[in-house]
Swiss-Prot record:
Keywords: ATP-binding, Ligase, Magnesium, Metal-binding, Nucleotide-binding, Purine biosynthesis. GO terms for biological process: 'de novo' IMP biosynthetic process. It comes from Corynebacterium glutamicum (strain ATCC 13032 / DSM 20300 / JCM 1318 / BCRC 11384 / CCUG 27702 / LMG 3730 / NBRC 12168 / NCIMB 10025 / NRRL B-2784 / 534). Homodimer. It holds the Pfam family ATP-grasp. Its EC number is 6.3.1.21. This is Formate-dependent phosphoribosylglycinamide formyltransferase.
Length: 408
């Protein structure tokens, strides 16, 4: 993977350029991290005024699943690095772009292609690497889906193979749920006529995200892996609501988690941050999913670590030394839109920031939806429990109002 010998000046012919494919709240923080290191940032999304658009040097609106549009933009900009920040991309074209040497795909084009859907990454994890996972079946039709659910037993979980943030995901408790779950999975998929994965229910004690960083070890000049402290999180309908770090684990469970994370990220290759999602039952660890990019539950690292997951991602991509030191226990709590409106306004910032050791990130998305993440509160404290209370209190103080209805 390419390592620049120097960093050029933005907006000049010798600029070192990064192109973000996906410009949401995570991409916004990545863009800021790269700008702090002196790189020229090009942010791409499917709609105007996305969060990262607002902080990048250049912004573009294209259909990122359209191979021709992706290629035209890469050939026009000629970025040094193309950094996927979402799954729904023309990954076959990224493979060609990488093979032709037009740009370095982060972490690799193969990783982007494998992780764009649950089928590719699950087969790599379970069938090629032999990692422990739940029992599962992939299905293309309702008939296959119904048979798989009966085979795996109830309760089980169904997800589209291509979706994000819990869209289309549901728990089946009996055969009475089959039709509704199938219809919901089809509506939540990113592509029409999507396949689904049906997973046997895993009885787990808790779930974690283990942020795994691949960069160059400055002492050996060779690729190496670092692990952030484990992040616990709570989900509702498949979407994260709050996260905290560190998540208390037994030494054996942590060792097993790091082993699973190292094996899957080594198989994907390249450099950067990987969000490895794991189920933990006692000392046993089960692989769930992996994202070859910063993870939404990792927003907590804005408060807890010396360098956030976004700063670590930027440094690792460039092959620079990384520092995963935890400086304080902390937590994050999501601020949802709660309404359907464009050009919303926010109140309650003073009340939220009056909570001790607390900060906010308002994502500045141009349109709010009831369950759309519009911001996050991050807090630190002497322990995780106190930090969770603080973050939840601060997030609840923020109110989202339609249009310009809020008073200044």
């Amino acid at each position: 993977m390419y390592i620049p010998e120097s960093i050029g000046t933005p907006l000049t012919p010798n600029a070192t350029k990064v192109m973000l494919l996906g410009s949401g709240e995570l991409g916004k923080e990545v863009a800021i991290a790269f700008q702090r290191l002196g790189l020229e940032v090009h942010a791409v999304d499917r709609y105007e005024h996305a969060p990262a658009h607002q902080v990048a040097h250049f912004s573009y609106v294209i259909d990122m699943t359209d191979a021709a549009q992706v290629r035209e933009l890469v050939e026009r900009v000629r970025p040094d690095f193309v950094i996927p920040e979402i799954e729904a991309l023309a990954t076959d074209e990224l493979v060609k772009i990488e093979e032709e040497g037009l740009a370095t795909i982060v972490p690799t084009a193969r990783a982007a292609k494998l992780t764009m859907n649950r089928e590719g990454i699950r087969k790599l994890a379970a069938e090629e690497l032999g990692l422990p996972t739940s029992n599962y079946e992939f299905c293309s039709t309702f008939e296959e889906f119904s048979a798989a659910a009966e085979k795996l037993g109830y309760p089980n979980v169904v997800k589209p193979v291509m979706s994000s943030s819990g869209k289309g995901q549901s728990v089946l408790r009996s055969s009475d749920d089959l039709q509704a779950a199938w219809d919901y999975a089809m509506s939540g998929a990113r592509v029409a006529n999507s396949r689904v994965i049906v997973e046997a229910f895993v009885e787990f004690d808790y779930e974690i995200t283990l942020l795994t960083v691949r960069s160059i070890d400055p002492t050996t000049s060779k690729p190496a892996t670092w692990f952030c402290e484990p992040i616990g999180h709570r989900q509702e309908d498949g979407d994260y609501v709050e996260s905290w770090q560190p998540m208390e684990m037994t030494p054996r469970a942590l060792e097993n988690a790091r082993s699973v994370a190292a094996r899957i990220t080594n198989a994907l290759g390249g450099r950067g941050v990987f969000g490895v999602e794991l189920f933990v039952s006692g000392d046993d660890v089960y692989f769930s999913e992996v994202s070859p990019r910063p993870h939404d539950t990792g927003l907590v690292t804005l408060a807890t670590q010396r360098f956030s997951e976004f700063e670590l991602h930027a440094k690792a991509i460039l092959g620079l030394p990384v520092d995963v030191t935890l400086i304080s226990p902390g937590a994050s709590a999501v601020i949802y839109g709660g309404i359907e409106s464009e050009g919303v306004s926010y109140t309650g910032l003073a009340e939220a920031l009056a909570v001790a050791e607390t900060d906010l990130r308002i994502f500045a998305k141009p349109e709010a939806f009831t369950k759309r993440r519009m911001g996050v509160a991050v807090s630190t404290a002497e322990d995780v429990a106190a930090a969770r209370d603080r973050a939840t209190l601060a997030a609840a103080a923020i109110k989202v109002h339609p249009g310009n209805s809020a008073e200044a």
